Each structure stands twice: as C-alpha cells, then as structure tokens.
C-alpha cells in the first residue's frame, strides 16, 4: 500500500506538515524547570458544574504554584451538544470564582500564542496530524454507513464478543487504493479511523498522579479520529491539542479513566511524550445515609449557577473546595489562619481517589469563617454586585443607604471574636433587611411568659426612658430598671435561683424590645443597631406597636 498516495487522495488540501506546527507555530515553551502547563477544557453545553470548578482549582494550583501556564480551551467540536451563549456562561462563571487564566478563550477574544483555543477553529491542524497518521499506515478511511455499523454491532452481540470496530469487524481497515478511489468517486462520505495495533488480551501499565500505578487493558478499537465533516472526535483533539499546546498535566474526572488506553496508544504512535494524567474522584454526597455521586438531575447544588444565584463569595467556595481537594488543608489553615490560600502548598499526593464528599452544611460553616475576615466595605460591594445581577429590586436601597448597610455589616465584627453568621448574599440581605421599612416585618413571637399587654407596658416604658445619646452601659442599665419595675429579674441567674419570685428576667424584656425594633428575637448588638438606625426610626418602630 502506498500510504503517501492514500494520504494525498484523502487530504489534497493539506500541505503543511506536523513538524511545521511543532517547530514553527507551536514550539516548546520557554519555561523554568518544573513549570507545569495545565488546561481546563469544558464543552459549551450550557451547564458548568462544581466538578468543572473542582478540577479547575487543581489545574490552577498546579500551574501557578510552579510558575507555569493555565489555559482555557473550549472543546466545541460536537455541534449537537452546543448551546447558544454557553461559552459566555462558562467564561463568566469561571471569572466569578476568580479563576485566572494565563492564556486561552475569553469573552473579548483569545489571549496567547498557542491558539486558536476553540477546537472548532483548529480543523486544519487536526487534519494535518490525521494525514500524517495515514502516511504512517496508522489511519484509514472508513465508508461504513450507520446501518452497516449497527449490523456489525448486532452480529457481535449475537456472538457474545466485544462490540466496536476492530479486527475482523473493521471491514474497511485494509481497503486497496483502488477501492478507496472508487468510494471517493461515488461521493461516499467517510470518517478517518485510527488503525490500532492493540490486542484485547494484553495490558499495559501507566502512572496516574492521583491514583498511582494502573494496569489497564490496551486499546484495540479502531476509533474515529475525524468525523465525516472533517472535525475531530474528543479523543483525537485532546491528544493533538495537549501535545501542541505543550500541556504537561491533564486533570480530569475519573469517568475518563476508561479512555486512557486510547490516548496512550495515540500518543505513543505519534512518538509524543504523554502528559501526566491526574484523574480526580467524583464529588459525592450523603443522601439518606447512602453515599452517592452528585447528580445534575437530583442536585441543584451541582451547578455553579446555584452558588452564584445565592451569592456565595468565591473565596468561601474556593476555601471549602480546598478542604476536599487536599486532606491536610484544614490543619494548615488552623496553623495559618490569616495566610492567603495561595500560600498553601497544594499537592496531588494529598488528593482522595475514592470519592470526595461534598457537604453544603460544611460549605456554609466555611463561608461564615471566610466572610468574618472580609471587611464590611468589601462585603457591601459584593452584595451590591450580586443584587445588580440577581435581585435588582434592592439595588436602589443598597445604594441609597450605603453607609448604614456597611455599618450594619460591621456590627460585632471588629472584636477578638468576631461574629460569624454571614453565609451568602441572599441570606445576608435577609439578615439586614429589617433596617429597611419596605422590608421590615415582625417575624418572631414574644417570649411565652410575655403577652401582648405586658409587651406594650415594656415598650411604653422603654420609649419614655430612651435616650439616643446613652452609651451602651447607660442604655442597658435603663432596661434592667424597666425589668425590675415590671417584675422581671435584673439578672438571669437571679431568676434561675428563684423562678417563682419573677415573671422572667431581663433577657425577656430585651427580647420584647428587640422584636419591636428588628422583628426578630435574636440579632447582633441591639444598641449598635439603634445607633445606626437613628432615634427617629427607633421610636417609630416602638410606637407602631403601642
């Protein structure tokens, strides 16, 4: 077989060589020893999920911790799965979580010297490599129709053998030049298949940076490299792009493990160095006591939009995911409470290979700790930015009352033990909306030992003695006086010792006042809140209940 002639028959329009792309267009990167090149390569299907972000943080840390390069590549070769606007969604979502790419696709165009970074724009490159494989005798045209392939599959099932296109079932594997020419003259569509030399009885070994040494069955399938429209399959594009973009580490989910033999054979056939493969564990959750994989259908928290709509701070999500990614992160954080997360020495050796457990409750706890360290001014700006996107009806209120909102967010946060009760924007607004008359409502009930008439007596006394200029001590002393004058213990411990002597204690009186002013039985420091509200609003809140 004259493979050179076959290649020219199939690819008359391809005039460049693989070495042209390797040496001229995409030469080896000039990086320091040990620098890693990673890529995130999502498909524009309209859904970007937590698993993408999980893997992206691994990519980002490997690259930036080694002074390497982090690439965003869009794998858009499957027209059937493309969703309008999905690329913009992917990029904006990743930007929201502060993932910084060094090169690749962007909303305003591409950055970098190893593009195009959209696979749909790299057709000539893939066809050049495919032509090279044909010249090597390791790829060939297949003219089988869908019906013929289905018939082959039915026969394989009937004979109880492996399904697929291989060995004796690869009916176009050894077509002559004359036969190929005849098919072409008949304008029959064709795909380009890889000619595998694998034996299904054989295995090979390969190292995975997370899972260690793996023993796997070799690939024996003659997989499709180029579809009939000249666009590559995922398997082929992945190998070509990772080689020419000089990717050193491929981070992907464990669901791709089964494809590793294909990629291994393609890399070795082309004489290219394999990247280091890092197959991450599935994100799992406990559901009714059973551990299962997070599901797009069952679990809204799998989609990144879930966190963006609620307004989780990207720093909180990243902090939490790092606790899942590396088993020693929490210990490091305890020892380095104020250090930047990028100072943490991330390691592939500390990653789980048996299913990473995702827990929303723990994310919320982590978020409380992270937000407690972020200045109120920054939280306000984040809240406003979130509102402009997801809760436009409160934007004007936040802007008109900027100083007051910042002060509200500051209450109880500037002490040795700052309050930790802010989680995400939706919850933060719920937490402070009592300040706005438009949203104020009485949510909680008075203590069981205080009826409506009793509450009015307390509130009336409070209104009569309230002086906005009182300091915190003077203010609370007046509340204690109101308590004792109305039969309540001035100290909870006094009530605890002699419950029959009192109606309740000063805490009950404070709760009545708190509910009147903020609508809830618990809140941050009430004296500070009143100082922010101003005397007029405080008196109005009390008066409306009398």
Curated annotation (Swiss-Prot):
EC number in record: 6.1.1.17
Motif 'HIGH' region, residue range(s) on this chain: 42-52
Biological process according to GO: glutamyl-tRNA aminoacylation
Residues binding ATP: 296
Reaction catalysis annotation: tRNA(Glu) + L-glutamate + ATP = L-glutamyl-tRNA(Glu) + AMP + diphosphate
Residue window of motif 'KMSKS' region: 293-297
Compartments where located: Cytoplasm
GO MF assignments: ATP binding; glutamate-tRNA ligase activity; tRNA binding
Record keywords: Aminoacyl-tRNA synthetase, ATP-binding, Cytoplasm, Ligase, Nucleotide-binding, Protein biosynthesis
Enzyme class (EC, first level): ligase
Annotated GO CC locations: cytosol
Family annotation (HAMAP family): Glu_tRNA_synth_type1
Subunit note: Monomer.
Family per record: Belongs to the class-I aminoacyl-tRNA synthetase family. Glutamate--tRNA ligase type 1 subfamily.
PANTHER family tied to this protein: GLUTAMATE--TRNA LIGASE, GLUTAMATE--TRNA LIGASE, MITOCHONDRIAL-RELATED
Free-text function comment from the UniProt entry: Catalyzes the attachment of glutamate to tRNA(Glu) in a two-step reaction: glutamate is first activated by ATP to form Glu-AMP and then transferred to the acceptor end of tRNA(Glu).
Name of this protein: Glutamate--tRNA ligase
């Amino acid at each position: 077989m004259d493979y050179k002639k076959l290649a020219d028959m199939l690819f008359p329009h391809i005039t460049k060589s693989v070495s042209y792309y390797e040496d001229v267009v995409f030469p080896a990167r000039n990086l320091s020893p040990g620098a890693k090149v990673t890529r995130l390569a999502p498909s524009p299907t309209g859904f970007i999920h937590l698993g993408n972000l999980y893997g992206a943080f691994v990519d980002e840390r490997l690259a930036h911790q080694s002074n390497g390069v982090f690439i965003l590549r869009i794998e858009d070769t499957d027209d059937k799965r493309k969703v309008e606007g999905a690329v913009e969604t992917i990029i904006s979502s990743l930007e929201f979580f502060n993932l910084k790419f060094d090169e690749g696709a962007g909303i305003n165009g591409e950055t970098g010297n190893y593009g195009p970074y959209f696979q749909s724009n790299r057709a000539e490159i893939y066809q050049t490599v495919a032509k090279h494989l044909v010249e090597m005798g390791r790829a060939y045209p297949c003219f089988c129709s869908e019906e013929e392939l289905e018939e082959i599959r039915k026969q394989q099932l009937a004979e109880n053998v492996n399904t697929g296109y291989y060995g004796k079932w690869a009916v176009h594997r050894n077509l002559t030049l004359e036969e190929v020419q005849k098919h072409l003259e008949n304008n029959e569509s064709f795909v380009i298949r890889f000619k595998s030399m694998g034996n299904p009885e054989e295995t090979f070994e390969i190292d995975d940076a997370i899972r260690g040494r793996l023993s796997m069955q070799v690939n024996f399938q003659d997989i499709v490299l180029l579809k009939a429209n000249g666009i590559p399959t995922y398997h082929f594009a992945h190998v070509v792009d990772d080689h020419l973009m000089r990717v050193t580490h491929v981070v992907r989910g464990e669901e791709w493990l089964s494809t590793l033999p294909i990629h291994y054979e393609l890399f070795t056939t082309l004489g290219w160095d394999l990247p280091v493969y890092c197959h991450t564990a599935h994100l799992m959750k406990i559901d009714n006591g059973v551990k299962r994989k997070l599901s797009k259908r069952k679990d809204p928290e799998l989609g990144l939009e879930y966190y963006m709509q609620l307004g989780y701070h990207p720093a909180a999500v990243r902090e939490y995911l790092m606790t899942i990614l590396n088993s020693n992160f929490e210990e490091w954080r305890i020892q380095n409470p104020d250090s930047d997360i990028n100072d943490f020495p991330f390691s592939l050796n500390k990653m789980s290979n048996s299913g990473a457990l995702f827990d929303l409750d723990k994310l919320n706890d982590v978020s409380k700790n992270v937000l407690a360290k972020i200045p109120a001014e920054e939280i306000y700006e984040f809240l406003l930015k979130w509102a402009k996107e997801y809760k436009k009806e409160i934007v004007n209120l936040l802007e008109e009352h900027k100083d007051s909102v910042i002060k509200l967010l500051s209450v109880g946060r500037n002490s040795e033990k700052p309050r930790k009760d802010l989680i995400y924007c939706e919850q933060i607004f719920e937490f402070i909306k009592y300040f706005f008359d438009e949203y104020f409502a009485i949510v909680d009930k008075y203590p069981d030992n205080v009826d409506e008439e009793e509450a009015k007596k307390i509130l009336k006394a409070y209104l009569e003695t309230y002086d906005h200029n009182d300091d915190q001590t003077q203010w609370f002393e007046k509340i204690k006086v109101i308590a004792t004058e109305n039969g309540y213990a001035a100290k909870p411990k006094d009530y605890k010792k002699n419950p029959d002597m009192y109606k309740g204690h000063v805490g009950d009186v404070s709760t009545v006042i708190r509910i009147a002013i903020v609508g809830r039985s618990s809140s941050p420091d009430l004296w500070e809140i009143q100082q922010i509200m101003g005397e007029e609003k405080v008196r109005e809140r009390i008066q409306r209940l009398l």
